[in-house]
A protein has these predicted regions:
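Hydrophobic alpha-helical segments within soluble ligand-binding/sensing domains
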Residues: 1-8, 54-55, 104, 120-137
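Short, structured loop/turn "capping" segments at alpha-beta junctions
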Residues: 3-9, 35-43, 68
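Short hydrophobic segments within beta-strands
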Residues: 12, 72-73, 154
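Hinge/cleft segment of the Venus flytrap/periplasmic-binding protein
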Residues: 16, 120-159
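Short, solvent-exposed amphipathic alpha-helices that sit
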Residues: 19-38, 57, 80-81, 124
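Hydrophobic alpha-helical
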Residues: 28, 43-103
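Glycine-rich, charge-decorated loop segments at or immediately adjacent to ligand/cofactor-binding or catalytic sites
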Residues: 102-113
Length: 159
């Protein structure tokens, strides 16, 4: 969908200490090793979910590995990382990120991000707090063990 030929990917994550970040990387790597032999992960960096750090580290990553032609952002810091791509005039890089938030939407409209994986971050953030509040203030236990959010992939055409 996003690239043709050999794909040399860089992974930009928030922290190796955050389970959802490491799970995303593991799932990505497992899937590409099983099904997509033309995709190779070149390097992985951590940006502490910070746009300024992401800018510096993504710029250094791309300078050290000019053969990278795809970036997979597993956490925050996408805006800073994309600014690094732009600062190097790397229009050949395809970018995959998470969550349709104003920054990623803007970057998609500017044709910088190719696709985002949406997972309803507002619900993910507010639902646990609401459940905990209801339990602590009213003694209402959650009505089920797991709450799932919808996951979909957005490209410019279905943004």
């Amino acid at each position: 969908l996003m690239t043709s030929g050999e794909v040399r990917a860089g992974i930009v994550t928030g922290s190796s200490q955050v389970l959802c970040h490491t799970d995303r990387i593991a799932g990505f790597c497992d899937r590409i090793s099983a099904c997509y032999p033309r995709i190779r992960v070149i390097a992985e960096i951590e940006n502490s979910d910070d746009d300024f750090e992401s800018y510096d580290k993504t710029r250094a990553l791309l300078s050290a590995h000019p053969d990278i032609n795809a970036l997979y952002f597993t956490a925050a810091g996408v805006y800073g990382g994309c600014r690094a791509v732009l600062s190097l005039n790397r229009t050949d890089i395809h970018i995959l990120a998470y969550d349709k938030i104003p920054a990623t939407k803007e970057l998609m409209e500017q044709h910088i991000i190719s696709a985002v994986i949406c997972q309803q971050p507002a619900i993910q953030g507010s639902k646990p707090i609401q459940l905990l509040f209801d339990y602590l203030t009213a003694g209402e236990a959650p009505d089920r063990e797991f709450y799932y959010t919808a996951v979909d992939i957005r490209i410019l055409e279905n943004l």
